[in-house]
Amino acid sequence: MKNPLRKRIPRELKGELGKYLVVFLLMVLTIGFVSGFLVADGSMLKAYNESFDKYNIENGNFRTAEKIYSSQWKGIEAAGVKLYENYYIEEDLDNGSTMRFFKNREKVNKVCLMKGEMPSGQGEIAIDRMYADNNSLKVGDTLIRGEKSWKITGLVALSDYSALFQNNNDSMFDSVKFGVAIVAPEEFENLDQEKLRYNYAWIYDHQPKNEKEEKKVSENLMEDIGKVVALETFVPRYLNQAIIFTGDDMGGDRAMVITLLYIVIVIMAFVFGITISNTIRKEAGVIGTLRASGYTRRELILHYMTLPVLVTLAGALIGNILGYTVFKGVCADMYYGSYSLPTYVTVWNADAFLLTTVVPVIIMILIDHAVLRYRLQLSPLKLLRRDFSGKKQKRAVYLSPKIGIFSRFRLRVIFQNVSSYLVLFVGVIFANLLLFFGMLLPSTLDHYQMEIQENMLAKYQYILSVPASAYSGNKEDAMNSLLEYYTDIRTDNKDAEKFSAYSLNTMPGKYKSEEIAFYGVEPDSRYIQADLSGDGVYISSAYADKFRIKEGDTITLKEKYEKDEYSFKVDGIYDYAASLCVFMERDKLNEAFDLGDDYFGGYFSDTEIKDIPSKYIGSVIDLEALTKISRQLDVSMGDMMGMMYGFSVIIFLVVIYLLSKVIIEKNAQSISMTKILGYTNGEISRLYILSTSLVVVFCLLLSLPVERQIMEVLFREMMLSSISGWITMWVDPMIYVKMTAIGIAAYAVVAVLEFRRIRHVPMDEALKNVE
């Protein structure tokens, strides 16, 4: 026999259409975004992993001062590799950026054409797609350098430049100030050949099984190549940040997005629970009659769970459809906004379906079942009498007669709806948390740039680079290279001050191992104002903050690819936020790492050093280099911040709307009675809407310190897992003002809707359910 309760479901849906529609739309948006993100993330990660074979990405590259000739070529390939030319020329453009020009590659590090056409003649160029986006360039535009110009014929992704690192030693790539491009062979010949870099890529005849084996094989290869030619640089793939950085970073946001989904689902489940409780109060007589007629508690639980579960399921299914169509593109664009990735093909993601459809439905079932089971514990007789007191009769909270009648009434409304307001508080915290994050990152990045500018060690730090030929197998060439290096790195710049440089890595653990720079400075240094005469070391404030190290602690670091470990006592913390580094006297550093008494690895200077050949300068750390991290984060996460703003306001509106609606419905009989007694709609609004208004403002203010504490944990986790280096969280006081103002403005919209609802409560409502 058919269950007659099923006939009530369409009627209940029609009667609560506004509530279910709002929740449905929120579910669709949330699940659609998360599904789209997971699908885009999985598809693009698959495309990235497959690109190594599809585009024949190099196993490494090296640079020489001169062109390799036929006999040398054969000698290198005899070491078990296939060699390819990968020459490039760098030019500074009129727009303030640097472009690295390559000939079109057809055998190794192949190019993915994203839009337009490949260059086929002189004066034509295809540029990196992300560089083009960040510099507002498109197909048909012109790039200019002095009197020379190139017409952009296409936008491309170079498979060996998925992250635009100009220098492999850089702490962060820069897709704004640096780009890569492809030109036709005849155009390449027309470029300034004095700037030509003889770069070569190699592919192993037999691929190493893992990174450890790759390290060993590459070290042997460097020695073998060094016996044949003098090396300037040597970068195996496992150390090439332009290739591996993207793969290491992709997938890191997955856990955060899934957590976002489940928090929204839990909030919606509790909102459903409260609305169901209100429905049970409203239909207590009907439920009591059904229970007395033989319907079991289980049958009623199933009935009242049906609509919430169906709405969740419908939202999940439509959200997944939108995820695979609309949101997938939105989320893919977020990745394309950070990395120079090739085209991808959407792949079915079983995890996405499980996490965005099955799990949300299970969460909804569990929470709603628990609420219904608790509410339907009352006996049929108590339900018929509308007695919801449970085992013990609750006593009303005493309120002093000295309090005005309206104030007492509002307090009663608040006390009667404590459970609804608790869920409201949780919803406000979560919505404001998203809004807080959206506002926090831009202000933190601005403050970080200002802090770096004020606390630079020197206006310029020159990190010297010993040519790879100095470590080659040919001892005579190695000695000559070393002598030439030490002769040419002397400078007449009076501002220049030598320092020793070394690097170790943090111990492996929960997060990836980080490189820590060591500065060995002069005892009377003009640039580092710290007492380094003790047995210990000073560490930068960024290092101390990131790893929560205090003065007197001991730090343990290790060689990156060796087992050797070093321990140092922290004598003090140096105010320097731009880098994770350690400071000690130069002779102590040289002795600790057996570098030799006269060794130094760089210069501090407040003026530019111009008398050292560029081939011996590994990197220059100036203001632009130090702010590269914040600049790139701002570019990469700009779209995400806008989405955070919008999403947080939507959640805030939905939660407040649903709970305010419940409170009005719960008090419909009382509102009707006050209308009979002659109170106007405005006066009734002062009783009910003003009560909720006070609670909302209180929740907004109370949530601010709670969100600050939560955000400190979340921001720290994000920085620990997503970037090398450290950016300290900084909160602009105006953020709190803006958050409160946005919250009040959003609630004002809901208050207008609730005022309309009060106006539509009929007077005959008071005559129903008269006890």
Question: What do these predicted regions represent?
Answer:
Residues 3, 376-394, 756-771:
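Short cytosolic juxtamembrane segments of multi-pass membrane proteins
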Residues 2-269, 278, 332, 337, ...:
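Membrane transport/envelope proteins' first extracytoplasmic loop
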Residues 317-354, 698-765:
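Short helix-loop junctions at transmembrane helix boundaries
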Residues 138, 296-297, 379, 550, ...:
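Short coil/turn motifs that cap or connect alpha-helices
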Residues 1-7, 392-408:
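Short, membrane-interfacial amphipathic segments enriched in basic
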Residues 15-44, 248-288, 306-323, 354-366, ...:
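Hydrophobic alpha-helical transmembrane segments of multi-pass inner-membrane transport and secretion
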Residues 62, 405-546, 550-553, 558:
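Juxtamembrane segments of multi-pass membrane proteins
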